[in-house]
Amino acid sequence: VTEKGGHISEQRRASGNYGVFSARYGNIYTPSQLLQLYQEAYGERIPAERAWSRADGKFVDPYRQQIQPEGFNSVDDLMEDRLAHLKAVRHLFENVDVFVFTLGLTEAWRSREDGSIFSAAPGVVGGSYDSSRYGFVNFSVEQTFEALNKFLIRFHAINPGAKVLLTVSPVPLIATYEPRSVLVSTTYSKSVLRVAAEMALNKFPWVDYFPSYEI
């Protein structure tokens, strides 16, 4: 755990999700999110959007929307926290022995400006939805594996001794943006993610799979 929050009170650590994740990123549902996190951490990309405002005047990190429930007091505070987070992410990637990643979703919301993937739809936790700026995407097998493959190649380059353990989330979707039953969308999503994981397993000898979905 790279972000333990030892510099703040125990109460704030609990409310701010410190020590919950290996780094304080919240839920990363898609390989595209994981890839863009890596790219930002290592200077390969600079997101067009830095902060979203809330109705209470606080600010939300668009890429970690629920990591700080009380919100940030200013954009500067948010960016200071994000830079510390990215430093922790780099430390994690470079020093971990086994990196476990659960593939969770194929549905996501994406910026039309720079292709950024968000952890939740704009307007749900912060910001506001504008169809000219954001769009829904439901990733295919090809798109899912492409992002996963790009991340794995980059990760292995900086930490060649590390292993990767992939899983597919067993949790079914509770809602879908597709105009169909959520049962159908769940089956599609799990199928895509499972195939992408198998493709990675077959390509990289240092990648393994744990059958959490199957169990």
Segments from the language model and where they lie:
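Extracellular glycan-modifying ectodomains
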Residues: 1-215
